[in-house]
Regions:
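Short Pro-Cys-Gly-centered "Cys-loop" motif that presents a nucleophilic cysteine in a tight turn
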Residues: 1-138
Length: 138
């Protein structure tokens, strides 16, 4: 399931649910079974109401947002290609995935630039008036 690698990135609340759905749908995506809740090593069965929660699985935050029926419906919607692409890009680079406000708050708290910047060298600005024009000297 993890393909021998570990990837992570900071996620805001809405992208947390996207990432959880993505992880729970991995066995389905790999054609290992038809429904996510059938995968024994996943939290999907608990989230879908097909199994009792284990002691290690904290459910309070999840229960505050979802019911088992809502989660089954959310899983049935599947991942959108745009969401999957954004999630993969962020996990490969380690950059945060969230709203601009979320990323700005992380930048303030870490004192680091976290949002991707434009590639390439900086554009040249207007010529500096203090530079000497060598063509006038000769």
């Amino acid at each position: 399931m993890w393909q021998g690698r570990f990837y992570s990135c900071p996620l805001d609340q809405s992208h947390l649910w996207t990432a959880l759905r993505y992880a729970e749908l991995n066995p389905v995506r790999a054609a290992m079974l038809e429904a996510a809740e059938q995968w024994r090593w996943s939290s999907a069965a608990v989230h879908c109401g097909a199994a009792a929660p284990e002691a290690l699985l904290a459910m309070d935050r999840w229960r505050a947002r979802w019911t088992a029926a809502q989660w089954r419906e959310y899983l049935a919607e599947g991942d959108s290609p745009r969401e999957v692409s954004a999630l993969r890009q962020s996990t490969y680079t380690g950059r945060p995935l969230g709203t601009p406000e979320f990323i700005a708050a992380l930048e303030r708290s870490t004192l680091r630039l976290l949002a991707p910047r434009k590639g390439g060298r900086p554009k040249k600005g207007p010529p500096d008036s203090r530079q000497t024009n060598l063509s006038l000297i000769a």
